[in-house]
């Protein structure tokens, strides 16, 4: 390697005497005389400026020749060769640069170049460059930058620079192919916060996310080539602003569906939770239809009691003479009450209430009851008696109905009407027999026996046998039959009256509350009607409706 100002290898300076002889010969022949070295200053600061393999030689004019028209001649030398070569486009030029890209296109070789200044007939010495290695010394220009903005992001697309080509029609070669390890240093400047940050990338795309909306950002990029340090060449600064925050249509749809699905899920979970809670804590049991909650004020408690319709029994009082009833007939009367079986389905069917058939089959005449017993004080067509005290409810009689306090079924009690019938031809001492309504078209045979029994004693011409009078009280809860003994209203009470029947009834406990001891020692009042005495003797409360 030689230093600038020394002869190039293979070209030693000629001796002064030989040069003088050559000049004389050229002058004799009439040719142009070349410049003669006479101490003209040489160009300065001669260097290669290479960008993307475009190699240009630059220099400065001689120091003492500013403003003077000076021409320059350029030669180049390929490292490893033996002679200098003239640059085809850089002989006797007046500019201070020479493009040697064609001569130095092989970037894997090393080159030298030299420049000489010529003014009139004088010239300067050669000014040479240092060895130039394009592959290591060329500068890579910044890539092409394309920016795309979003609400909070900026997308940066980078395109690698191209290698210099002699003709535009030549094949394009990217600097990425020459330098596979080419990198890019991206710098972003926030104009609001006045902050800059850099990021080195190897790919051609960079997305900057989570930026501030509606903010101006400035971006510049420079190429980095691994190897010896090179002068950086940053790109031109490009600025772009992020978009304002806007609720786009697809975001609105996403929010809508999110809220909708969340609401549906919450509703389903709530419904399932409610059903589970109701299944666990809320009972589904229902009380039987025949039970109702009855509030009893006199006790202060509430109990369950069958809710069935109260049936009113028609009670017919027949005034019979004890003297006309024989013991045989009394036994038949007892037998008629005792032989009825509650388990007999035929019997139960025979006693189903049919009001239309029963109204005409009373044992007595209710319309003339008050004429015979009460002294014709009330002579209306129908006398209604209302009895209070059964199950703490009002029992309607006749055609007047009073709805009970609670709903009751019609198959628990039978509806009825208290009817009193007095036969004027019977004796003073009578027997009262209370019967329920006959609920079928054909009367029960046992009731027929009782009916015939009364007729027997009425039409009998022979006097009754003197037998001990027997009082019978019989009530069958299944059939509703109620047989009440005759009242001692005429002052003749048989011995041990009512004890036998009372003892039998008290054993079952059915009439324990209804039965009260009669008062045979009570003085008799002739003007007291039979209904009043019946109420006093039996402890009944009967309301007479006019």
Swiss-Prot record:
<feature type="signal peptide">
    <location>
        <begin position="1"/>
        <end position="32"/>
    </location>
</feature>
<feature type="disulfide bond">
    <location>
        <begin position="218"/>
        <end position="239"/>
    </location>
</feature>
<feature type="topological domain" description="Cytoplasmic">
    <location>
        <begin position="275"/>
        <end position="546"/>
    </location>
</feature>
<dbReference type="InterPro" id="IPR015373">
    <property type="entry name" value="Interferon/interleukin_rcp_dom"/>
</dbReference>
<dbReference type="InterPro" id="IPR050650">
    <property type="entry name" value="Type-II_Cytokine-TF_Rcpt"/>
</dbReference>
<dbReference type="Pfam" id="PF09294">
    <property type="entry name" value="Interfer-bind"/>
</dbReference>
<dbReference type="GO" id="GO:0019221">
    <property type="term" value="P:cytokine-mediated signaling pathway"/>
</dbReference>
<comment type="similarity">
    <text>Belongs to the type II cytokine receptor family.</text>
</comment>
<feature type="glycosylation site" description="N-linked (GlcNAc...) asparagine">
    <location>
        <position position="185"/>
    </location>
</feature>
<keyword id="KW-0472">Membrane</keyword>
<feature type="domain" description="Fibronectin type-III 1">
    <location>
        <begin position="42"/>
        <end position="138"/>
    </location>
</feature>
<keyword id="KW-1015">Disulfide bond</keyword>
<feature type="glycosylation site" description="N-linked (GlcNAc...) asparagine">
    <location>
        <position position="86"/>
    </location>
</feature>
<keyword id="KW-0732">Signal</keyword>
<dbReference type="InterPro" id="IPR036116">
    <property type="entry name" value="FN3_sf"/>
</dbReference>
<dbReference type="InterPro" id="IPR013783">
    <property type="entry name" value="Ig-like_fold"/>
</dbReference>
<feature type="glycosylation site" description="N-linked (GlcNAc...) asparagine">
    <location>
        <position position="45"/>
    </location>
</feature>
<protein>
    <recommendedName>
        <fullName>Interleukin-20 receptor subunit alpha</fullName>
    </recommendedName>
</protein>
<keyword id="KW-0325">Glycoprotein</keyword>
<feature type="transmembrane region" description="Helical">
    <location>
        <begin position="254"/>
        <end position="274"/>
    </location>
</feature>
<dbReference type="GO" id="GO:0042015">
    <property type="term" value="F:interleukin-20 binding"/>
</dbReference>
<comment type="function">
    <text>The IL20RA/IL20RB dimer is a receptor for IL19, IL20 and IL24. The IL20RA/IL10RB dimer is a receptor for IL26.</text>
</comment>
<dbReference type="Pfam" id="PF01108">
    <property type="entry name" value="Tissue_fac"/>
</dbReference>
<dbReference type="InterPro" id="IPR003961">
    <property type="entry name" value="FN3_dom"/>
</dbReference>
<feature type="domain" description="Fibronectin type-III 2">
    <location>
        <begin position="139"/>
        <end position="245"/>
    </location>
</feature>
<feature type="glycosylation site" description="N-linked (GlcNAc...) asparagine">
    <location>
        <position position="94"/>
    </location>
</feature>
<comment type="subunit">
    <text>Heterodimer with IL20RB and heterodimer with IL10RB.</text>
</comment>
<dbReference type="GO" id="GO:0045124">
    <property type="term" value="P:regulation of bone resorption"/>
</dbReference>
<keyword id="KW-1133">Transmembrane helix</keyword>
<feature type="disulfide bond">
    <location>
        <begin position="90"/>
        <end position="98"/>
    </location>
</feature>
<keyword id="KW-0812">Transmembrane</keyword>
<dbReference type="GO" id="GO:2001244">
    <property type="term" value="P:positive regulation of intrinsic apoptotic signaling pathway"/>
</dbReference>
<feature type="topological domain" description="Extracellular">
    <location>
        <begin position="33"/>
        <end position="253"/>
    </location>
</feature>
<keyword id="KW-0677">Repeat</keyword>
<feature type="glycosylation site" description="N-linked (GlcNAc...) asparagine">
    <location>
        <position position="203"/>
    </location>
</feature>
<dbReference type="GO" id="GO:0016020">
    <property type="term" value="C:membrane"/>
</dbReference>
<keyword id="KW-0675">Receptor</keyword>
């Amino acid at each position: 390697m030689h230093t600038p100002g020394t002869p190039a290898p293979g070209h030693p300076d000629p001796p002064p005497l030989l040069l003088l002889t050559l000049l004389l010969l050229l002058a004799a022949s009439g040719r142009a005389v070349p410049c003669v070295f006479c101490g003209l200053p040489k160009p300065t600061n001669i260097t290669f400026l290479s960008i993307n393999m475009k190699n240009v030689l630059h220099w400065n004019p001689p120091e003492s020749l500013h403003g003077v028209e000076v021409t320059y001649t350029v030669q180049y030398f390929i490292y490893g060769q033996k002679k200098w070569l003239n640059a085809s486009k850089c002989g006797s030029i007046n500019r201070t640069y020479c493009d040697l890209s064609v001569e130095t296109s092989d970037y894997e070789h090393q080159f030298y170049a030299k420049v000489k200044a010529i003014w009139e007939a004088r010239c300067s010495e050669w000014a040479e460059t240092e060895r130039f290695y394009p592959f290591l010394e060329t500068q890579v220009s910044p890539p092409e930058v394309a920016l795309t903005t979003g609400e909070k992001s900026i997308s940066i697309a980078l395109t690698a620079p191209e290698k210099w080509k002699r003709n535009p029609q030549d094949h394009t070669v990217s600097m990425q192919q020459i330098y596979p390890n080419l990198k890019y240093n991206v710098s972003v400047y926030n104009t609001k916060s006045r902050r800059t940050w850099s990021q080195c990338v190897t790919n051609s795309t960079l997305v900057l996310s989570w930026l501030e909306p509606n903010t101006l950002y400035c971006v510049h990029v420079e190429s980095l080539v691994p190897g010896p340090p090179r002068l950086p060449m940053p790109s031109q600064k490009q600025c772009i602003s992020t978009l304002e925050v806007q609720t786009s249509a697809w975001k609105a749809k996403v929010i809508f569906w999110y809220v909708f699905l969340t609401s549906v899920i919450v509703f389903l979970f709530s419904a399932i939770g409610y059903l589970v809670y109701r299944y666990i804590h809320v009972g589904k049991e229902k009380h039987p239809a025949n039970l109702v909650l009855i509030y009893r004020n006199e006790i202060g408690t509430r109990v369950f009691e069958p809710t069935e319709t109260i049936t009113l029994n028609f009670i017919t009082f027949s005034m019979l003479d004890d003297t006309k009833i024989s013991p045989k007939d009394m036994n038949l009367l007892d037998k008629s009450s005792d032989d009825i079986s509650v388990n007999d389905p035929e019997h139960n069917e025979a006693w189903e209430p049919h009001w239309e058939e029963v109204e005409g089959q009373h044992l007595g005449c209710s319309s003339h009851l008050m004429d015979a017993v009460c002294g014709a004080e009330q002579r209306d067509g129908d006398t209604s008696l209302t009895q209070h005290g059964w199950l703490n409810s009002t029992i309607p009689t006749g055609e007047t109905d009073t709805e009970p306090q609670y709903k009751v079924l019609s198959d628990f009690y039978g509806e009825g009407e208290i009817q009193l019938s007095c036969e004027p031809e019977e004796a003073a001492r009578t027997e009262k027999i209370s019967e329920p309504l006959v609920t079928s078209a054909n009367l029960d045979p046992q009731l027929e026996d009782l009916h015939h029994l009364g007729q027997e004693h009425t039409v009998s011409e022979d006097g009754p046998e003197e037998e001990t009078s027997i009082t019978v009280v019989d009530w069958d809860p299944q059939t509703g039959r109620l047989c009440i003994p005759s009242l001692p209203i005429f002052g003749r009470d048989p011995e041990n009256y009512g004890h036998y029947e009372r003892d039998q009834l008290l054993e079952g406990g059915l009439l324990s509350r209804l039965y009260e001891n009669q008062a045979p020692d009570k003085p008799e009042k002739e003007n007291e009607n039979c209904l009043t005495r019946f109420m006093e003797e039996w402890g009944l409360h009967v309301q007479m409706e006019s």
